[in-house]
Swiss-Prot record:
GO terms for molecular function: ATP binding; ribose 1,5-bisphosphate phosphokinase activity. The keyword Transferase applies. The keyword NAD does not apply. This is Ribose 1,5-bisphosphate phosphokinase PhnN. It catalyses: alpha-D-ribose 1,5-bisphosphate + ATP = 5-phospho-alpha-D-ribose 1-diphosphate + ADP. SUPFAM superfamilies: P-loop containing nucleoside triphosphate hydrolases (SSF52540). Catalyzes the phosphorylation of ribose 1,5-bisphosphate to 5-phospho-D-ribosyl alpha-1-diphosphate (PRPP). Keywords: ATP-binding, Nucleotide-binding, Transferase. Pathway: Metabolic intermediate biosynthesis; 5-phospho-alpha-D-ribose 1-diphosphate biosynthesis; 5-phospho-alpha-D-ribose 1-diphosphate from D-ribose 5-phosphate (route II): step 3/3. ATP binds at G10, P11, S12, G13, A14, G15, K16, D17. Belongs to the ribose 1,5-bisphosphokinase family. One of its GO terms (biological process) is 5-phosphoribose 1-diphosphate biosynthetic process. The gene is phnN. InterPro entries: P-loop_NTPase, PhnN.
Length: 176
């Protein structure tokens, strides 16, 4: 069975990490599903499932092609380890939280790609971002002003119970 790279995108505060955590728990018994940790040039937080990488290692990894995908956002570097591409090639469904900016390149990579957009109304996004209380989240207005600009295979409006939104995500992953 062919693998699939599932790219989860959406604005800050949409609840991507919450839904990914719930989906990972729901699919924990099935080795076909992989939820790798991103590399980010900041210390990990309780709200995200990331590993820290310093700026020099990030720049070196980008230059050497050691990442499946990499991008910069909010003044930080983000990357998916090269093992992500191998897992897709082995037939796994690999589910990653990424920037919309990398979707076009991922679709051109020759891998099977599915895009899931998780979103919420601006007032909910603002409330969730403010509740994090992280100085590195930067300018709240700038984060909320970003446009989608990506065609998704599934869009989840995450305004109600997280379990309901996660069930939609899990159903999509099982269909991949």
């Amino acid at each position: 069975m062919p693998g699939c790279l599932v790219l989860v995108v959406g604005p800050s505060g949409a609840g991507k990490d919450t839904l990914l955590r719930l989906a990972r728990a729901a699919l924990a018994g099935d080795p076909r599903y992989v939820f790798p940790r991103r590399l980010v040039t900041r210390p990990p937080s309780a709200d995200e499932d990331n590993d820290e990488i310093d700026e020099a290692a990030f720049a070196e990894g980008c230059a050497a092609g050691r990442f499946t995908l990499s991008w910069r956002a909010h003044g930080l570097g983000y990357a998916l380890p090269e093992a992500v591409g191998r897992r897709v090639a082995e037939g796994h469904v690999v589910v990653c939280n990424v920037s919309r900016r990398v979707v076009a390149g991922a679709r051109e990579s020759g891998r099977r790609v599915s895009v899931v957009e998780i979103t919420a109304p601006p007032e909910i996004l603002a409330r969730r971002i403010a509740a994090r209380g992280r100085a590195q989240d930067g300018d709240l207005a700038a984060r909320l002003a970003r446009e989608g600009g990506v065609t998704a295979d599934l869009t989840i409006l995450n305004t109600g119970a997280a379990d309901e939104a996660a069930a939609r995500l899990v159903a999509h992953l099982r269909a991949c």
